[in-house]
Amino acid sequence: MFTGTGTALVTPFGGDGSLDEVTLRALIKRQIEAGIDFLVPCGTTGESPTLTHKEHLRVVRITVELTNGKVPVLAGAGGYNTAEVIEVARELAALGADGILSVTPYYNKPTQEGLFQHYRAIAEAVSLPIILYSVQGRTGVNIEPATVKRLAQIENIIGIKEASGNVSQMAAILNAVPENFIVLSGDDAITLPVISLGGRGVISVVSNEIPAEMSELTRLALHGDFSGARAIHRRYHPLMEINFVESNPIPVKAAMAEMGLLKPVWRLPLVPPKAENQARIRAVLESLELVEQIPAGRGAESAHAAIAS
């Protein structure tokens, strides 16, 4: 269900900082029409820490309604309070989500045993499939391969989004877990190495911009056509890289605004990219013919975006 390319959906906001439901619906429809494999609302790229609880549920509800069973929905439900994560997971199940992506507890930095008990408690409380989400660079805690192996024995913990950037660790996880346990890259740029080791795809940022192309990349790789997949990777690698020139999702939303897909609005503490980075983003988009080339200076207007508080 959660293999291939899953888009970590951005959350669009209006000029007043409110949830832009019209644009959200348009973005979801664009993803479906492009042939995306699954959608991931309310993750890191969706600015989930800045969403209210009501908004979080609303984004997932809209995603579920629009996909209407055509594309699986893996909704974000993670945090440092196990009881609250369970409550949110139950609400997402009631909304019709097909699974949950659950980031490791952050800030309080649990031990490996604490991580195991945290995820076991969630799995026992809901029947939905659970994808673990390990991203030490953001949370300060890593799910070690031995802990992933233990968690993989729990029936409805079916996979992990591994965003450590450590290919050796991903290989160790793949060697430790059952063959049907799904290991997904959390980094667009190393999707091909992960698939070559036995991974099953990627939860992608760049597919917000190029859903059809990223979906094709993983389909080719999963069917053994690494030559074709490499060609796509090489073409779009500059876009994958520029998406992280500042903290995600600042650059990807700036790029999407340049492409006319949404308003360039972030919620504090996220702010628009620096002018020089905005120019770099624009240059990459132009080089890939994702936007028209325009006279210097005019494309940087979106750098002065309103910031929603």
Language-model features: locations:
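Active-site beta->alpha loop and helix N-cap motifs at the rims of alpha/beta catalytic domains
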Residues: 1-7, 11-140, 148
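Surface-exposed amphipathic alpha-helices with a cationic face
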Residues: 60-68, 90-93, 123-124, 152, ...
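Glycine- and other small-residue-rich loops at beta-strand/loop junctions that grip anionic moieties
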Residues: 77-78, 104, 108, 133-140, ...
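Catalytic cores of alpha/beta
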Residues: 81-92, 146, 173, 189-197
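Catalytic beta/alpha-barrel core
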Residues: 100, 155-165, 181-184
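Catalytic pocket-lining loop regions of alpha/beta-barrel enzymes
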Residues: 142-159
